[in-house]
């Protein structure tokens, strides 16, 4: 994996002091159901603002609008801004993990943003037991203990951030937490339709239940996590961790790869049916997993498979959108940043390809900064700014994706 050389610059530019009051504009649905008022372009800084400063400004806006300042969940973040009547005491695990990933980039860039405290709060989502009598991370928290269903993909992205935290903070407890995720996987893998993980422990092998499936997200991100953990795990664990990663990768490659374009379908249901929807992040996870498997095993087919999926991903998802000639999808920016990170994983083996992909992404991000934000400094889901959807734009996950995107670009192109 590429190791970035950081050059933390002094923070130049004017910081916009933005209020979170009345941040969502009144929405008037158009014929398409998700069009509305023209987004207000934020005030342009007097001098060109570097990406690390933009990332910090975005984090500050998230803190102002989403962070909980009192009660049992103080220090956590709300799922939506404004908070909805049916929202939980704190956000679900997925958007919180996305936020921690963004904060990790700020920590790398030299900002003191409470990174360690945020990582440690993962444990408030931990459940020592549920359907499977083994510990794993639940989807919700009351500020002290975990609750909700336990998803295998959620646990994978937590694991990825715990490995990152170990690299940055050097605290061995994060490796202990990763080892527990591996045990959760060992308990969750079965041989139904081939040896792989289900989406959620509550929906294992239930034909007729659409939520009972073995998905690309759980198995792909588990592979990515396992290969990151392999680098730092105790020697006694390495053989089992590598074998599990290879097993999950092979299942995905054999069961959910579209042989026509080397992209990955969404899932295989308990009834054996394939959900053929293709999402950026699923292919991204397999790119990253393939690169790392090649780097560890030396087996060239992993790298060739990663390159094939990467090239098809660019060709399939980068197209003209809303007047922008080359544009990644305008929905689900968290999915997109996972694909982008997989392209960066590939860079040591295909620098020109990664640079091409990054140039388009950086251009999209520049447009988002100019045209795809609210007057609070928060981002719309659609970075072109053409389709405003308050029900989606208000989500913490959208802001976490923007923050991580800015941080990743700052590290890639400081």
What do these predicted regions represent?
Residues 107, 166-170, 230-237, 294, ...:
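Short coil/turn linking the two alpha-helices of tandem helical-hairpin repeats
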Residues 217-229, 238-290:
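Active-site cradle of extracellular carbohydrate-active enzymes
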Residues 1-19:
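Sec-dependent bacterial lipoprotein signal peptides
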Residues 44-102, 106-153, 214, 301, ...:
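CBM-like carbohydrate-recognition segments
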Residues 279-297, 302-318:
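Oxyanion-binding "anion nests"
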Residues 113-232, 242-246:
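Extended ligand-binding groove/face enriched in aromatic
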Residues 15-53:
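Bacterial Sec-dependent N-terminal signal peptides
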